[in-house]
Design a protein with these regions (language model features):
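Short, glycine-/Ser/Thr-/acidic-enriched flexible segments
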Residues: 7, 77, 118-119
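N-terminal Rossmann-like NAD(P) cofactor-binding module of classical short-chain dehydrogenase/reductase
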Residues: 1
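Cysteine-nucleophile active-site neighborhood
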Residues: 4-74, 124-126, 130-133
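A glycine-centered loop/beta-turn motif at secondary-structure junctions
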Residues: 104-139
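Flexible, glycine-rich phosphate/dinucleotide-binding loops
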Residues: 56, 100, 120
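Catalytic beta-strand/loop cores that center a nucleophilic Ser/Cys/Thr
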Residues: 67-109, 138
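Conserved Rossmann-like nucleotide-binding pocket used by diverse enzymes
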Residues: 30, 92, 112
Length: 139
């Protein structure tokens, strides 16, 4: 589990290197918020500072795998640049307000992450399935 946290993921090259090693070892991984940005950087993607951060409990996100929309809680000021995807990452979720990346999965690896906060309570519970998927992958 790569937890959330404050700040610019580019200031954490040590974390990016650690995640590269974990992904290379085929370890199972679930990233949340900052963890999503670090996983993206570990796959060669870049992040950027949002003009206006995503803050609050009513951000609509589309799951591109299922086609369903989810209401999410968010609190981040950086985003993943989809133009820097070298093909190693599948973009799984996008923000319906501004089309920013909200979820990724590393192709061929048991590693995925979301930019928002599925653990947030009180708040929307549309994304609780992510924890079920991660726990199931551990079995």
């Amino acid at each position: 589990m790569i937890s959330n946290g404050p700040g610019d993921p580019s200031a954490m090259p040590y974390a990016v290197k650690t995640i590269q090693n974990i992904v290379s070892a085929d370890e199972k991984m679930f990233g949340i918020c900052l963890g999503s940005q670090i996983l993206a950087q570990a796959q060669g993607m870049k992040t950027f500072k949002l003009h206006r951060g995503h803050r609050g409990q009513n951000h609509p996100v589309k799951n591109l795998v299922t086609g369903k929309s989810e209401i999410t809680s968010q609190n981040h000021g950086f985003a993943i640049d989809p133009e820097t995807n070298n093909g190693s990452v599948e973009i799984t979720h996008v923000n319906l307000n501004d089309d920013t990346v909200e979820g990724i999965k590393v192709k061929g690896k048991p590693a995925f992450a979301v930019q928002y906060h599925p653990e947030a309570s009180p708040g929307p519970h549309d994304s609780r399935y992510l924890f079920d998927e991660f726990v199931s992958s551990l079995a």
